[in-house]
Structure formats: structure tokens, C-alpha cells
A protein has these predicted regions:
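Residues on the lipid-exposed face of transmembrane beta-strands in outer-membrane beta-barrel proteins
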Residues: 1, 5, 31-35, 66-70, ...
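Repeated loop/turn-to-beta-strand initiation elements of outer-membrane beta-barrel proteins
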Residues: 1-3, 39-45, 75-81, 110-115, ...
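Loop-centered beta-sheet repeat module
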Residues: 2-54, 58
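Transmembrane beta-strands of outer-membrane beta-barrel pores
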Residues: 7-13, 20, 47-53, 72, ...
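Outer-membrane beta-barrel translocator domains and adjoining extracellular loop/strand segments
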Residues: 15-22, 50-61, 92-99, 125-132, ...
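Residues that define the transmembrane beta-barrel architecture of outer-membrane proteins
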Residues: 25-29, 60-64, 77, 94-100, ...
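Outer-membrane beta-barrel translocator/channel fold
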Residues: 47-56, 78-101, 112-147
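Outer-membrane beta-barrel "beta-signal"
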Residues: 149, 183-218
């Protein structure tokens, strides 16, 4: 079990991004509890209080998250599953804002396949440009849903650098308020090239701990 606690200034930076010398009062806090019963499972719960984070919106924000992860691995193969839930409660809002995230990854060297499901409540007024400040004029909240499926393949190393190429496709479902802008079923895709610097003898960080290099990297 691990417990984390932090105290900080909750206000977001204004348009003067470099004016960071005046951090403001330590008026906000967050705490997180981790529980890892064995090498396969990890659980966490967190809660935070943000004192007036937005200068143009009244009130405070309370945020809560919970997640569970499962991992099994052997040599150059692994399977990982993660589910995360989050909720934001704004003083000036009429309801909670929820988010759900589920991801699965399967590696069977040199291939990786992955999928991701996301459902997020959004303030549609921000996207429509109809939101006014001081807590009025907010459009009805809506939920954006996205499903992503992708794959990646490792390439031969180049001077110790790890290369991989991959791509994925995402299908979205948007609330009725946003259909006129984004369509009812927006689809996006991307291709990417991944580059990793050579692994040191200490290995990489994974799940908050050091992971030794795989055999082909030593």
C-alpha cells in the first residue's frame, strides 16, 4: 500500500504563462491510495479539492478517480488491461461530469495490438462557443464516446535506438448538440513512427518501478 498527499495552488495560470514566480496560496490538496496485492494487480483511488481553478468561472472543483490494472508478462510478451473512472464536481454546475476509460494491450514480439474505449461528459457550450462566464449560459452537457483499435510493429534497431511503426482508427459518437459540427459518427485515423533512445543498464520506468531491458536489448 502506498499513500500520496500533495498541497498546491489550485488556480490555473492566466495569459501571462511565464509569471510563475507568484504561485499563490497553497489552497488546494489531493490524495491518492495505491494497493498492489501481487505482481499482476494494481488498484488506486484518488480525490482532490481545487480552490477556484478557473479565473472566469466561479466556485471550486472536486475530482475523484478510481482505477484497476491487470498485467501478465513473460519474456517479450505481455497482456495489460486498465479501467479508469473519474468524476468532477463543480460548484457552479448543475450535475457531475463523468469519464470512463478502458484499455487493453497485447504484445507478442515484434507485434503489439491495442484497443481503447472512452466515454467523457463534455461541456458542449465550450465547443459550440455559446458558453458565457460567471456560471451562466452553459449548454446542456453531453457524452462523447470513442472506440480505438490499433497495431504496432517493432523494426530493426538502429544504433541502439528502438524503432516501431503503427497506426490506429477511432470511431466516435457525439451528442446531438454537436452533430451539426462533427457529424453523428466522426472517424479519425493516424499513422506514427516511434523512436526510443537506447536503454541504460538500469532499464526503463514501468508502472512506477524500474524495468530491466529485455534480452534483445542487453
Amino acid at each position: 500500500i502506498a499513500i500520496e498527499v500533495s498541497v498546491f495552488h489550485g488556480g490555473e495560470p492566466d495569459e501571462h504563462r511565464w509569471g510563475i514566480s507568484d504561485i499563490g496560496a497553497l489552497d488546494s490538496w489531493a490524495t491518492r491510495v495505491w494497493f498492489q496485492p501481487d505482481e499482476h494487480w494494481a488498484f488506486q483511488v484518488s480525490h482532490g479539492f481545487l480552490k477556484k481553478p478557473e479565473a472566469l468561472e466561479p466556485g471550486n472543483v472536486r475530482r475523484t478517480t478510481a482505477s484497476v490494472s491487470w498485467l501478465t508478462e513473460s519474456d517479450a510478451q505481455f497482456t495489460a488491461l486498465t479501467a479508469v473512472y473519474g468524476r468532477s464536481d463543480k460548484d457552479h454546475a448543475d450535475s457531475f461530469s463523468d469519464a470512463l476509460f478502458v484499455e487493453a494491450t497485447r504484445r507478442f514480439s515484434p507485434h503489439v495490438i491495442y484497443s481503447r474505449f472512452e466515454a467523457v461528459d463534455v461541456e458542449t457550450g465550450l465547443l459550440l462557443g455559446t458558453t458565457t462566464h460567471m456560471g451562466s449560459g452553459h449548454a446542456e452537457p453531453g457524452t462523447v464516446v470513442a472506440l480505438t483499435v490499433g497495431a504496432m510493429r517493432d523494426l530493426p534497431q538502429l544504433g541502439g535506438f528502438e524503432l516501431a511503426v503503427g497506426g490506429d482508427v477511432t470511431v466516435h459518437k457525439v451528442p446531438a448538440q454537436l452533430v451539426t459540427i462533427y457529424g453523428s459518427r466522426p472517424v479519425s485515423f493516424k499513422m506514427f513512427l516511434r523512436l526510443r533512445i537506447p536503454v541504460s543498464s538500469m532499464g526503463r520506468m514501468q508502472n512506477g518501478t524500474m524495468m530491466q531491458p529485455m534480452r534483445e536489448h542487453q
